[in-house]
Regions:
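Short, intrinsically disordered, charge-balanced linker/junction segments flanking boundaries
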Residues: 154-162
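Carbohydrate-active enzymes and regulators
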Residues: 93
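Donor nucleotide-activated moiety binding/catalytic core segment of transferases
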Residues: 145, 149-151
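Conserved small/polar residues in nucleotide/adenosyl-binding loops
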Residues: 163-169
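Metallocofactor- and cofactor-centric catalytic cores in central/energy metabolism, strongly enriched
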Residues: 4-85, 89, 98-113, 117-128, ...
Length: 170
């Protein structure tokens, strides 16, 4: 049993010292095996995290991998929206985001409450959001797109579209 310290919650991560004799990588791999957990890391994470991960990719590839994993626990080393996306795709799995301070400026640039009001003020439109949005923003959209399929999806609708966040490269 692990005790959660308030300072860890305040910081958003655990930064306790690690004994030098501890083989942390082996300990993590063994814990993942025991707990049936998979570690997924975005390309933006540090190399040491990517080396430990079972799968490394962009947000779309990570979401696709999460949807297919048989693991009970997904450790998503990335930003909030990636963990949220994994939870949406895998509601019966436990999804952990190790660094609660890891945010995406693109996702943060579209507050869900403001976007919801904008959508309400423009009825009759198909609402499209980019994958780099929060779950709350995705909840008021009809279609979620990625940089690889945005053009095809947008062109498939006749007109009257609302689109949030730009399709910046990942």
């Amino acid at each position: 049993i692990y005790m959660v310290k308030k300072e860890w919650i305040d910081k958003g991560f655990v930064d306790e010292p690690i004994a030098k004799e501890l083989d942390l990588k082996s300990e993590i791999r063994e814990l993942c095996r025991k707990k049936n957990a998979v570690i997924m890391a975005h390309y933006y994470t540090e190399g040491i995290i990517q080396d430990l991960a079972d799968f490394v990719g962009d947000s779309l590839a990570l979401a696709q991998k999460a949807a297919k994993t048989e693991a009970d626990i997904i450790v998503m080393c990335g930003v909030h929206f990636m963990g949220e996306t994994n939870k949406i795709l895998c509601p019966d799995k436990k999804v952990l985001v190790p660094d609660l301070n890891a945010t995406c400026s693109l996702a943060e640039s579209c507050p869900a409450d403001e976007f919801s009001r904008f959508v309400s003020a423009h009825p009759g439109h198909t609402v499209i959001s980019y994958v780099n949005t929060t779950a709350a923003t995705k909840a008021v959209t009809d279609v979620v797109v990625t940089s690889s399929n945005a053009r095809q999806i947008v062109e498939s609708f006749p007109s009257c579209l609302l689109y949030t966040s730009d399709a910046a490269d990942e």
